[in-house]
């Protein structure tokens, strides 16, 4: 691909509103000014270097465009179950806990709920932001408070002022990383602002507060949990809904998908298998079938050059 072809390819994408200079800059590592000047043949710098970077961007763009489009979001039975808890917490201004094994769809359900509802804010806790200050800072950024205070006391007060009267919902994903001090801070924030709060994570997020593991530290929080939703495994109805979204309805294929969904990682592994199977089938001009699904599930554990699948 010569420089003229690269310029023409980029110009076509921008003129057809398939992308923007800003998006190309973000994904290529170049500035918007450099890209604009290069496309218009007015760049005075190293055109060879820029053309190589933009050629790599173009190749990746077209490779992604060739991939079969997966369903954007599938509203499964488990999703509805999670949404019910979120609505309850929001409407009753209370605390709900959603816990379950990895890969059952908790995070995607929460993201979609945030996307389709007003005043819903979601943060994901990592070990590096599990302290009171870091957790509250993460929440402040999610709320658009980019100039928020950097000390716990002032930050907590600023968050209370921001959340009061919003009738909103705060979702804390991976809340099992949080200790008693942070959870108590979130409880007080929820109580004072009368917003809903959903703590979401693995079963430890709930077991810390119950049974033999419950301590005095967690007692006040536990007594204020209004609703608990535990998702132990993938439901058959979830797998059927996902298969329908992918237009897969063969009996053998459905049975295999049910088996895959029972593996560790559940729906996450299922969706990876479906995407890889769809890529392989698409590259051969065929529909996804049992053989492609089995091959995809095996290859997820192997060293496979994915880029070759579309060329076969």
UniProtKB/Swiss-Prot annotation:
Site-annotated residues for Involved in DNA binding: 151-152
UniProt xrefs under Pfam families: AAA_22, Phage-MuB_C
Residue ranges the UniProt entry marks as DNA-binding: 21-40, 223-312
Cofactor field: Mg(2+)
Coiled-coil residues: none
Site (R-finger): 224
Domain of life: Viruses
Annotated site location: Sensor-2: 268
Entry protein name: ATP-dependent target DNA activator B
Organism this protein belongs to: Escherichia phage D108
